[in-house]
């Protein structure tokens, strides 16, 4: 995590440069919109198309797949994408949930994605599963009654497990 949803920078410029170099050596990265902008040295994208182009710019010449997460953008639908180094793009959409229970969404998505990839899913399959799971976790986070009133509460990581 380089930049929080609040916009606060969580690391200094030297660490940002080190992360740029490290990110080019990993299989998959999951930056939020402000983090993606830092990785490519541009202003944060204001549209999904701009974010996808920034991801394509980043992974050009690398073997790194970039997950574009559209949660910081506006609209009734959240668009996310797997942007592969070979130019393949898979878009995964979910309805936007209007809630204050969004604390930890980026870390939760990254963890779910890594788990599904380790279980044998392709990155695209892993993102589809993870977005569906996270959408449910966000939608039901308010039922936890944590961080309220007025604060950002967590998503409900265990919602799906309790439905089994």
Language model feature labels by segment:
Residues 125-164:
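Charged C-terminal helix
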Residues 88-90, 116-130:
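Phosphate-handling active-site elements
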Residues 38, 100-123:
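Short, small-residue alpha-helix embedded
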Residues 4-6:
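Conserved beta-loop-beta/alpha segment of the NTase-like Rossmann-fold superfamily
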Residues 35, 70-74, 95-98, 130-134:
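Glycine-rich beta-alpha junction loops
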Residues 89-104:
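Short pre-catalytic strand/loop immediately N-terminal to key active-site residues, enriched for Gly-Thr
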């Amino acid at each position: 995590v380089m930049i929080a949803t609040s916009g606060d920078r969580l690391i200094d410029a030297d660490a940002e440069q080190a992360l740029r170099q490290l990110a080019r050596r990993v299989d998959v990265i999951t930056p939020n919109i402000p983090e993606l902008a830092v990785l490519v040295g541009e202003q944060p994208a204001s549209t999904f198309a701009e974010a996808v182009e920034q991801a394509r710019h980043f992974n050009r010449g690398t073997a790194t797949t970039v997950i574009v997460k559209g949660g910081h953008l506006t609209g009734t639908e959240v668009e996310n994408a797997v942007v592969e180094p070979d130019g393949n793009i898979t878009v995964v959409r979910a309805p936007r949930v209007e809630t204050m229970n969004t604390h930890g969404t980026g870390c939760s998505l990254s963890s779910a994605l890594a788990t599904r990839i380790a279980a044998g899913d392709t990155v695209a399959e892993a993102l589809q599963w993870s977005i569906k799971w996270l959408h449910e976790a966000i939608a039901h986070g308010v039922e936890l009654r944590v961080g309220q009133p007025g604060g950002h509460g967590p998503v409900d990581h265990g919602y799906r497990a309790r439905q089994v």
